[in-house]
Amino acid sequence: MIQMQTNLDVADNSGARRVMCIKVIGGSKRRYATVGDVIVVSIKEAIPRGKVKKGDVMKAVVVRVRKDIRRADGSVIRFDRNAAVLINNQSEPIGTRIFGPVPRELRAKNHMKIISLAPEVL
């Protein structure tokens, strides 16, 4: 569960290392985001010569959360860290590579480009 002020790792090669959620998109009173949801983030830590720089405000898709993800078959999946992938206004990833596994739930939310770039889909 991601809410405002949550720090997330960045799971792509856009140049950002750490971001902070500043808004959960989807209604004025929407409080939490989970896997596949789009959030607005501020970049808190970035590498030199990256595509983004510290202080930029961007959109991101949440790809990993520490909170349990319950599936229809009763199984539960959980990750060690919260992570997101930066996207542009056309909902395409800014980076060209995705690091670490991503869950199948992204497919239902139509983030097919992220699924295809990911090394492992759980």
Swiss-Prot record:
InterPro entries: Ribosomal_uL14, Ribosomal_uL14_bac-type, Ribosomal_uL14_CS, Ribosomal_uL14_sf. One of its GO terms (molecular function) is structural constituent of ribosome. SMART domains: Ribosomal_L14 (SM01374). GO terms for cellular component: cytosolic large ribosomal subunit. GO terms for biological process: translation. Keywords: Ribonucleoprotein, Ribosomal protein, RNA-binding, rRNA-binding. SUPFAM superfamilies: Ribosomal protein L14. Signal peptide: none annotated. Part of the 50S ribosomal subunit. Forms a cluster with proteins L3 and L19. In the 70S ribosome, L14 and L19 interact and together make contacts with the 16S rRNA in bridges B5 and B8. Binds to 23S rRNA. Forms part of two intersubunit bridges in the 70S ribosome. This is Large ribosomal subunit protein uL14. It comes from Rhodopseudomonas palustris (strain TIE-1). The gene is rplN.
